[in-house]
Amino acid sequence: MAIDVFYDDDADLSIIQGRKVAIIGYGSQGHAHAQNLRESGVEVVIGLREGSKSRAKAEEAGFTVKTNAEAAEWADVIMLLAPDTSQAKIFAEDIEPNLNDGDALFFGHGLNIHFKLIEPADNIIIGMVAPKGPGHLVRRQFVDGKGVPCLIAVEQDPKNNGRDLALSYAAAIGGARAGVIPTTFEAETVTDLFGEQAVLCGGTEELIKTGFEVLVEAGYEPEMAYFECLHEMKLIVDLMFEGGIANMNYSVSDTAEFGGYLSGPRVIDADTKKRMKDILTDIQDGTFTKRLVANVEGGNKELEELRASYNDHQIEKTGAKLRDLMSWVKVDARAETA
């Protein structure tokens, strides 16, 4: 099924230019949205909690910084870019009391709306503008006259102008230079969580760790296992990123390609696919979100325990030692966060 893609010619930039936008949060996405909007002629303020360490950065960049509540009261478009686990509290305490008829509440990710952790009144536009890239890339591409593709969605549209507003916002941060793709809160939320859990974070992490363990337990040096199972992952992913899986197979040796075809399905088999479907079900029916909320309400105890156990793995100690030999790794990391 073909998807619609919208570009600058499809967007009316004057719509968002006629609004007052509050960016709640000044992290990776927040700083990029705010600066790109401002340079597109949009009036922007930053909303931060009292004592936020990001305040100095926002003020240094020339923004007016208000409390979350003050920013929400001032604005008629509020983009909530605080962490997912903080959003419901910020909404209840600071945003909801300051919403007026026709205001728009935008998100960069759909979790809190789709799973009804946040439920604005019926007279509020609920929308999403989600660049498919980290904030530093959104900013850098904008400065270079380009853009990062964006997803947009509208969950609630009392005045039938939400989609035009979301498209205008996406254009103002550079998204329509590359392409803006309409979706739904449900599709964005479920696919994003599934990708993180089954493939990008959870799946990849366990694959790397298990491969490392198999080699070390077979008597091979941890350093060799690290190089082969983790370090070279970037080389392979970069090839897939640039041209797809076929490009990766074309670029590696015939030995690697042939071995991959034979052994890949032995690692990721029908049972793995079934368990991935179980993960998808847990996401769709809210099981994961309930556990996420319980973790937050419990003071992040489960998260901290899991983090500590993973950070103590031998692969972390081996990697720290080997990365000290790689001067280019630290240089690349600094460039990505600049």
UniProtKB/Swiss-Prot annotation:
Residue numbers binding substrate: 253
Positions annotated to bind Mg(2+) 2: 192, 228, 232
Annotated catalytic residues: 109
EC number: 1.1.1.86
Key words, A-Z: Amino-acid biosynthesis, Branched-chain amino acid biosynthesis, Magnesium, Metal-binding, NADP, Oxidoreductase
Molecular functions per Gene Ontology: ketol-acid reductoisomerase activity; magnesium ion binding; NADP binding
EC class (word): oxidoreductase
Co-factor requirement: Mg(2+)
Domain of life: Bacteria
Cofactor note: Binds 2 magnesium ions per subunit.
GO cellular component: cytosol
Binding sites annotated in the UniProt record for NADP(+): 26-29, 49, 52, 54, 84-87, 135
Pathway: Amino-acid biosynthesis; L-isoleucine biosynthesis; L-isoleucine from 2-oxobutanoate: step 2/4; Amino-acid biosynthesis; L-valine biosynthesis; L-valine from pyruvate: step 2/4
KARI C-terminal knotted domain span: 184-329
Catalysed reactions listed for this entry: (2R)-2,3-dihydroxy-3-methylbutanoate + NADP(+) = (2S)-2-acetolactate + NADPH + H(+); (2R,3R)-2,3-dihydroxy-3-methylpentanoate + NADP(+) = (S)-2-ethyl-2-hydroxy-3-oxobutanoate + NADPH + H(+)
Pfam families in alphabetical order: KARI_C (PF01450), KARI_N (PF07991)
Binding of Mg(2+) 1, residues: 192, 196
GO biological process annotation, one example: isoleucine biosynthetic process
Domain KARI N-terminal Rossmann, chain residue ranges per copy: 3-183
SUPFAM superfamilies for the chain: 6-phosphogluconate dehydrogenase C-terminal domain-like, NAD(P)-binding Rossmann-fold domains
Family assignment from sequence similarity: Belongs to the ketol-acid reductoisomerase family.
Function, in words: Involved in the biosynthesis of branched-chain amino acids (BCAA). Catalyzes an alkyl-migration followed by a ketol-acid reduction of (S)-2-acetolactate (S2AL) to yield (R)-2,3-dihydroxy-isovalerate. In the isomerase reaction, S2AL is rearranged via a Mg-dependent methyl migration to produce 3-hydroxy-3-methyl-2-ketobutyrate (HMKB). In the reductase reaction, this 2-ketoacid undergoes a metal-dependent reduction by NADPH to yield (R)-2,3-dihydroxy-isovalerate.
Name of the protein in its database record: Ketol-acid reductoisomerase (NADP(+))
Organism of derivation: Corynebacterium jeikeium (strain K411)
Origin organism lineage: Bacteria, Bacillati, Actinomycetota, Actinomycetes, Mycobacteriales
